[in-house]
């Protein structure tokens, strides 16, 4: 009888759904999806802690989770043009609660006054991580490695001017990984910029929006050549989702509904899913 009841308990345990998890996105326009319809995508599916009615990349994450059968409660705290130090100084009251996962996305050049310098970025990341871990010592805190800005690559006056389009993203990735290695409480980084680079290198996406978008390729930047397009944010969201959940994003498939909502074809969605998966696989080797 005891063995029989134990067997039933085991079956029930296996059949029980995974516990819901909470994720918070902290960032700026690269998180809320400025310059693309992503910004207003399904705002009712997420909780905007600033009550601005934003969906953004967090709403794409939630959509992927629903389609994958994963139970995630998704929140965001975003402000345009701000770095992580701003969020720590001004938004602690909103952030200071229990989270399972927190995604930190900083300024596009790490430091507005000293582009490429991760010092201020790293200090603020550590402060936010400490705030999060005071509520949940097991929380996963990840830094987003953002993409190369075409405007800072193909126009003069930037430290990245005239360099290959992959250079800025590579520099940002190296800086974020250094912060993760040396800052207590940071679990790791998410290679969004590397995914953009891979999409360009493999011919899925166009390298230079200033000379037009090559036929058959996707444009990853918005019209300002700075923020993301629908495709660019879609690739960002896929990379974050795959990293956080360890879900093989290729399984979302050509029929993934958010891609269709954003005007991407099934073929384009599948190509971006493959790029995100390949980027994460290479990173995890």
Describe the residue ranges of each PLM region:
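Conserved catalytic region of serine esterases and O-acyltransferases that act on ester linkages
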Residues: 188, 209-285
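Extreme N-terminal starter segment of soluble prokaryotic enzymes
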Residues: 20-22
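N-terminal signal peptide c-region/cleavage motif recognized by signal peptidases
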Residues: 15-18
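Short polar catalytic/cofactor-binding loops
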Residues: 27-32
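Conserved SGNH/GDSL esterase-like catalytic core that processes O-acyl groups on lipids
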Residues: 33-133, 270
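Bacterial N-terminal signal peptides that target proteins for export
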Residues: 1-8
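Alpha-helical cap/lid subdomain in secreted, periplasmic
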Residues: 93-230, 242
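Acidic carboxylate-rich catalytic motifs and surrounding loops in phosphoryl-/glycosyl-chemistry enzymes
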Residues: 74-81, 190-195, 254-256
């Amino acid at each position: 009888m005891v063995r029989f009841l134990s067997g039933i308990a085991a079956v029930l345990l296996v059949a029980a759904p995974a516990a819901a998890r909470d994720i918070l996105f902290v960032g700026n326009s690269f998180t809320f999806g400025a310059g693309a319809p992503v910004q207003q995508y399904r705002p009712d599916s997420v909780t905007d802690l600033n009550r601005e009615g934003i969906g953004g990349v967090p709403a794409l994450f939630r959509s992927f989770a629903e389609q994958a059968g994963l139970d995630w409660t998704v929140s965001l705290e975003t402000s345009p043009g701000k770095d992580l130090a701003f969020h720590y100084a001004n938004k602690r009251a909103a952030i200071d609660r229990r989270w399972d996962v927190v995604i930190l996305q900083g300024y596009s050049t790490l430091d507005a006054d000293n582009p490429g310098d991760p010092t201020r970025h790293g200090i603020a990341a550590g402060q936010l991580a400490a705030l999060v871990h005071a509520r949940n010592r097991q929380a996963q805190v990840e830094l987003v490695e953002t993409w190369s800005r075409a405007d800072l690559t193909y126009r003069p006056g930037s430290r990245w001017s005239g360099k290959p389009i992959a250079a800025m993203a590579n520099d940002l990735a190296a800086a974020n990984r250094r912060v993760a290695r040396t800052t207590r409480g940071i679990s790791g980084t998410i290679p969004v910029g590397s995914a953009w680079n891979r999409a360009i290198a493999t011919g899925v996406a166009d390298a230079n929006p200033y000379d037009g978008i090559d036929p058959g390729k996707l444009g990853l930047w918005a019209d300002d050549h700075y923020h993301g397009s629908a495709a660019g944010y879609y690739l960002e969201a896929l990379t974050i989702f795959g990293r956080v959940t360890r879900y093989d994003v290729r399984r979302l498939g050509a029929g993934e509904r958010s891609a269709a909502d954003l005007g991407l074809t099934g073929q384009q969605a599948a190509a971006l899913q493959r790029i995100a998966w390949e980027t994460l696989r290479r990173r995890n080797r």
